[in-house]
């Protein structure tokens, strides 16, 4: 289960004020670039998106603001900016493909084709770009017309710039000469990968210390006479650094960076400064598009000004016709798929609290699907994504996407009943968790801690070995919330296996098999 960090509330927008502000910003950016060339300065602009997650058409914010975002609107904005600014670059900061049926059906190639169509100069790997496994990822590399920038990833003894096969496309950094100035772009990925993704999906790739990799890349880029260094980092704004977003410490420890473009944390942060580095983050799903303006003195070649802002992609931006023409067949096919009915719900099914009906239903369906694939289990440990109750009526594929928004693989392992108790006890400390250990009853001891398991009215011996299924995200630690679980499953005796079955597919298959739930 991937945790999505909620962005700050988008304030109410006064239409007239926004239009005036946007027009002024656009005019300033455009006239500023041209006026700079008339004097003894020149502006190089960098346009950036991040965490598109396969969104092509408008969507909603987490707070419910509708009809915003989508790559098709970002494309319109970027084309407009390019007309205003003759010297520009366009980059994406990761998590490009995972998140929508239309992207999933194409294996992500549609999104990469759209980046190619718009002439992106580079994109950076995000953690969710690994979700579909190494074969799909390598297809994306082969498809990409631009380099994939990630300095802090290794494969065995090989480093970026020294990979073979499709991975040749992955470089630590690239240099682009724009308007006579050399702009180095260095990519970084979050070091949180091993706490979310199993080795089978990473395909031998490992994230290394981003500060060490960045320092080496900056040294190389400056040695190649870079006039400015821009970092595209799939690590984002947080109130404080954490294991997945150590942005403050990285920029504190590494000199020579002028701009940091952030991703991963799904925040709209138009402009902030850390250790004299200008930072910007353009939210998620194309809801904002970001722009950096770097102004250089033409005589000294020094960087004399840096500015950053983001723009809300609402209905003031048309859907780009070229993007829509390329995406339309896939969008129409996805619409048909999403409308497919998979089951009928006969009565409300609760989705709140530990042991809720929806979590229990998921566990039952996962078990049944694994059994049909010759992988029977004794237990399933899983929860919901806080999507609420299921109401009576038809249940469609679209509903299944809301219930399970990620393609997390099912993992099986052989553990003792005592191990399962330890797993449940660890999860009990997570106040927002509704994970359920099906089909067991967890009996609390003195103090309320889980003390024993019961099944069909009898205690389960602590040393009994049982095969349990859970999703790969939880098996890897659930974002470091389940480190004891990770340790238990990593033991050789657990015989841990990652199945080729993802949880949403298991849900859909199980519902189709049942036909009626409730």
Specify the residue positions occupied by each region the protein language model found.
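N-terminal secretory signal peptides
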Residues: 1-13, 21-27
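Acidic, metal/ion-coordinating pockets
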Residues: 2, 19, 35-315, 357-368, ...
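Catalytic centers of hydrolytic enzymes
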Residues: 40-64, 69-77, 83, 196, ...
């Amino acid at each position: 289960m991937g945790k999505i960090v909620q962005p700050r509330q988008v304030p109410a927008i006064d239409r007239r004020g926004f239009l005036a502000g946007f027009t002024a910003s656009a005019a300033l950016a455009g006239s500023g670039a041209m006026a700079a060339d008339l004097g003894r300065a020149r502006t190089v602009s960098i346009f950036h998106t991040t965490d598109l997650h396969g969104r092509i058409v408008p969507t909603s914010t987490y707070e419910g603001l509708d009809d915003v975002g989508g790559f098709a609107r970002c494309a319109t904005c970027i084309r407009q900016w390019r007309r205003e600014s003759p010297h520009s670059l366009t980059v994406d900061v990761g998590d490009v493909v995972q998140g929508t049926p239309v992207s999933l059906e194409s294996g992500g190639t549609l999104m990469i084709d759209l980046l190619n169509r718009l002439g992106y100069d580079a994109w950076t790997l995000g953690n969710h770009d690994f979700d579909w496994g190494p074969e799909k990822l390598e297809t994306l590399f082969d498809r990409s017309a631009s380099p994939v920038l990630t300095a802090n990833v290794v494969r065995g003894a090989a480093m970026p710039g020294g990979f073979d096969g499709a991975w040749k496309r992955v470089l630590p950094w690239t240099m682009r000469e724009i308007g006579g100035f050399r702009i180095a772009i260095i990519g970084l990925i979050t070091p949180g990968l091993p706490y979310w993704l199993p080795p089978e999906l990473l395909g031998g790739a490992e994230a290394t210390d981003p500060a060490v990799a960045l320092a080496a890349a900056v040294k190389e880029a400056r040695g190649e006479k870079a006039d400015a260094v821009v970092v595209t980092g799939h690590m984002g704004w947080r109130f404080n650094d954490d294991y997945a977003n150590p942005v403050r410490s990285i920029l504190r420890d590494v000199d020579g960076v002028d701009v940091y473009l952030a991703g991963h944390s799904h925040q709209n942060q138009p402009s902030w400064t850390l250790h004299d580095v200008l930072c910007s983050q353009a939210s998620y799903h194309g809801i904002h598009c970001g722009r950096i303006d770097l102004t250089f003195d033409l005589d000294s070649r020094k960087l004399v000004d840096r500015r950053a802002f983001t723009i809300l992609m609402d209905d003031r931006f048309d859907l780009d016709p070229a993007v829509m023409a390329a995406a339309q067949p896939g969008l129409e096919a996805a619409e048909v798929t999403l409308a497919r009915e998979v089951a009928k719900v006969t009565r409300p099914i609760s989705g709140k609290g530990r042991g809720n009906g929806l979590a229990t239903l998921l566990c039952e369906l996962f078990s049944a699907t694994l059994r049909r694939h010759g992988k029977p289990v004794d237990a399933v440990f899983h929860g919901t994504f806080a999507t609420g109750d299921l109401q009576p009526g038809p249940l469609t594929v679209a509903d299944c996407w809301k219930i399970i928004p990620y393609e997390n693989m099912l993992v099986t392992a052989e553990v003792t009943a005592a191990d399962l108790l330890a797993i449940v006890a660890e999860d009990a400390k997570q106040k927002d968790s509704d994970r359920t250990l099906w089909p067991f009853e967890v009996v609390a001891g003195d103090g309320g801690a889980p003390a024993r398991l019961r099944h069909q009215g009898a205690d389960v011996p602590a040393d009994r070995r049982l095969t349990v299924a859970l999703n790969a995200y939880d098996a890897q630690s659930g974002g470091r919330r389940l480190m004891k679980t990770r340790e238990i499953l990593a033991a050789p005796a657990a015989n841990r296996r990652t199945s080729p079955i993802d949880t949403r597919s298991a849900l859909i298959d199980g519902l189709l098999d049942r036909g009626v739930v409730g």
